[in-house]
């Protein structure tokens, strides 16, 4: 090692330890003391000063192993000295090692730094407190990497010995050397493989087997728990380490093992690892809190061979003093599986304390389950109980934590979780009636070798339905047509809160225990086709209990290791775009929701358990869709459901992506349940499925961003319009037992929007069945409206999936009644607003809050849309279907027409909700909504022009509240006003407006009024003249900012007024009144006023038999409330038509810059409404005349054809370009201008804003409440709008001025054409600023090689910025006006006029520097020549050498070294190293002393060698290179002279000047070349003069040695002189003392006498 230095080796600077050549370590690394800041700066400053003296021309790099993430102190200090400091961490998950990738970076950086040629780079190593162990490892790795040492253990021990042994013990409680040796072996093996470092090989860490257990706690045994750290295999970009797995510290998951009881212990892990992994085995004490490390290992997966890692006792990091606790035979075997391996299910047994509980299953039983999954037969009655589930039996004391797989087919089996500490059996069965299903297969499910399901997300592929017509790879998981399909039974349908409640009666485990123990881990994903979690319940307690009962060594990711549902598409979850695996009950919903639900009397049984028969009826009546098939939940045993890293699953936060929707299966499956309900009138409508299913789906969903409120959604017992932004929602509350009973035929239909009391149980009969074709056609329409397409504007809208359309938040029966048969599922665009919350997951989840749910669905899904009317004849309905399909796409795809009124589902959220029978629907009401496609703007096609601002991806639609779906907040108590929805982003693409669904008992929804900017969209077509109008379409996406909502459709006679839309944010339309409560319901509180200057919402309409809502709604014959005034800058929406026989409401005053709203069409018998007052209408946009009475046609159509069979299209909006409208209606953001009023830009608000603090909810009894109640807030004001516009107009430049100024600016500064890369062009222009002359003059100076005009730096810059061949070609091919080119292009063009301009510039540069170059070169040659002559001709030097030879022979007399005739030149330095016996003098001092006394004339011999010092700084090699450069340069001059002869007149001056220069230069070069030859010979002769070989002792070494001898000689002579003076002074002093002493002696006798 370099520590054993050679004799001449320089001593390193103080306080640095030299590890190898130019590699040093700060000595503070070997101490545990911590220096103060000032002391540390002084310490480093002293070292740096020494380094700079020691290595005057070197560069320094410091590698620092720092503590924590903050900037290191050494960086701050050394940056002042221009030293580079690279920081590395000092550990990896508490292990004093670094990831292999980081080690490789360190080694490569060090190697390249130290091996740079021509530079004496120095590497300094530093570590902060506690970093010595990793620094020692990295130094060892560097020595091995550079092959300076061999043998990993020897090298590591050698480096560790540089520090005190106690330091390593102090800094590392475990001996880190075994893992460090493992990584040193990785480094040593780097040449064996092709690539190093190898790629991170993904593996499945299966289990750990321990043989011959160690003793802990006084030889009691060992209670091992495991933790695994590593990088998240799913986070491709994030390389940081996380906790991948951890054992729960509970009695059921840990066990004390003793050597006498077991030979080996198998600890299951089952987690994915990749790259560097740290595995810790920890002994847990009896208190289950205290821990003691058993061992730790760090390894890299790329070096695992044959899927096993065998470790002896000496190959693990263990505590320093516990080796005696480990038997010599102790071994650990880490077993792996391939990343994609399917672990075969093997027979396993579970032992428990109770000997009677012994279960055994075989692979055959599991494959029986798989067979059942694969062979579900389509039953004509849509009822088949295929209950086959994998049951995991785990015993709490099973040492290996194994599981039992059990498959059985048992109808009406409920989740049974008997929990005593020994037996935990979960029989999870779901009774599922399946619709026609093609094939159900278990696809690529991974099972562990002991039969456990691989609970890691990567390893579990979806158990999906094998659709013949369904695409295998889905970007998103499709929504099932049937709400029962969305029920996603993962465990039994009854395995919801109800059974969990019953289970909780048997379980005694407390809820808080699992939560507090390992909160940071996430849930594991269980295998199952949309399997329900094993424990997601109505109450928290049963859920956690059920998890606790899952067996002993469970490594549960969250306190509740609940199965996660797998999307039902065939592809892996990786292929689904937004398969967010939902959080479980405990993490997703507060317990308060359960309480509030029970308070709302949703459940009557004590524990909220639904009786078996009720559930069975419920299931059989309702669950008959393809999706409600057997799901196979696999409840991992504790060991098989370990913690995953929090990053492995989306966190259960409100911003998680919604879960995927269930996918449709096939054409047979597309026959929605509504078709069954509609087509067969005799059977009662399928009641809603158990809340279990809905709950499971929603409770698992990671909550997306808080959605805005549903349209007129209400809490279960509250009439308030807007629910609060949801917290992580609770699981759905258990339904009342009577909710499962078959619903009786209905009484007269009440209004569908009424919020019923929870206990009301009457349900209306299903609508009359339409003809098959018409039903099929309507099914096409329904799915289309529910999806949004995120394709770019140029791409067509993909066919939407057939998800439930209006089943917003409703239970499965909503879809059953509302969904009609539909064709096989297309690739699934995200469902739009009609999918239940739990099934609505297809929209990509961008951060903006999702739009409100579709049609005023209550949070608890009580109020739903009216039932679908009987479909019209096939042709008409089919036509409307395609309109509907196109209407689903957002404006980012080609604009679909507004969809015709789709069929709204029955309002069957609960058994107690009313199901309204649909009225027969005439054809004209099916597609009354005009299609945007046929609203051309002056003949232009209706393809939507892209929005002015790029629309962000639409936010996910609101999850539709399904009981307490993930996004829905817990229902508040009666009358508690919910908080307003979050404001939508300001820009977005306009979604098409949805058509109002025609229904019998529900008024049409007034779409939200126009938002702050833009004109109102065309109003939706009027629904049929009888029956209540349909509910309002939902507002557009929250980020839609360019489309105004369609005006509210006219209400039908006999129907209650439509519920108004929710209040939009930021200048959006005013909120709608809440839906009227149902009979006996409490009156809802008044709706909150709109946000940001929006007008207050109209009062809610009254309900049948219900209490009057706070604001008096307009009744029949009464004048409806006036529409809210439009927001600033936006055109007002058309006012809603008056009620039958009622006076029309006055239209709102239009605001400046917006088109006036069309007047509302009068209803039958109603007076025509007054025309809107003239306001700030755009030019040429007169208000449309009111339509004639008697019918309710839409506003006048724009030019262009009308849709076949549809109502008249609405008037076009101002400035629209045929953009599509969102199916939900544009409720917020900037409105979409109507086509037809010219293509003027959309006008922004022309008024100054009033920055007030807005009240969003009118408190009951307040002034605003009274104004709302009496409708006064929406009456036309006395203020003159035109005067307001004049006084308070915003300063906006007129378009004419803008265009004029633009023209001026264009004329003043024309556009420059840029052909060259912008960065290069900028750099070129910067360079040209230093050449302050026109380009032609510059080129003339170059050709004349005029050194007075340009300097050498400018010429070098011109050479650097010469055009390349590619740039020349680019400019040559440019055919445009060259005067418009940029300055860089002009410069290049000027250079291109001269042939070979770069060569000419180099000639000029050579000429410029030639004189100086020759002068300096001659000076160097003369210095060398003079030095050689001086040394050889110096007689004094020769005499001194002769005396040294004599002196040496005298000393070496009689030895082999004696009798020398001469000595080598480097022996001169030995004179200073040879000391006298008294150590007071060296041989050099003696020589100088003798010469000074005997031959003082020789002492000034250095004066004869004056040129020696300057010559010693010259390298003959550099002289040779310079000579070669001069000769080559002259050759190039001649070549260019020859070539320029053919250039023509452009090079005449250049050629003449160059010829003259070459003649002079050749003479100079010949002289210098001759001198160079002489100098070379003299340098060689100098080595010969001292008897040296010039090849071994070159001129440079000779001069350096002589110069060093002169320095030492002078120094010794000076010291001799000083010593002589001291001795002389000392002698004088002694003489004086003697003299004084003698004087005293002579005086004494005189005194005596």
Curated annotation (Swiss-Prot):
Gene3D superfamilies: 2.60.40.1110, Formin, FH2 domain (1.20.58.2220), Protein tyrosine phosphatase superfamily (3.90.190.10). Residues 421-483, 598-616 have a biased composition (Basic and acidic residues). The active site is at residue 127. InterPro entries: C2_domain_sf (IPR035892), FH2_Formin (IPR015425), FH2_Formin_sf (IPR042201), Formin_homology_domain (IPR051144), Prot-tyrosine_phosphatase-like (IPR029021), Tensin_C2-dom (IPR014020). Residues 1237-1635 form the FH2 domain. PROSITE patterns: C2_TENSIN, FH2, PPASE_TENSIN. GO terms for molecular function: phosphoprotein phosphatase activity. Residues 648-662, 680-691, 701-711, 722-732, 743-752, 795-804, 821-832, 843-854, 865-874, 893-904, 944-960, 968-1213 have a biased composition (Pro residues). Residues 1-194 form the Phosphatase tensin-type domain. Residues 500-513, 585-597, 665-678, 809-820, 878-890 have a biased composition (Polar residues). Belongs to the formin-like family. Class-II subfamily. PANTHER family: FORMIN-J, FORMIN-LIKE PROTEIN 15A-RELATED. This is Formin-like protein 20. It comes from Arabidopsis thaliana (Mouse-ear cress).
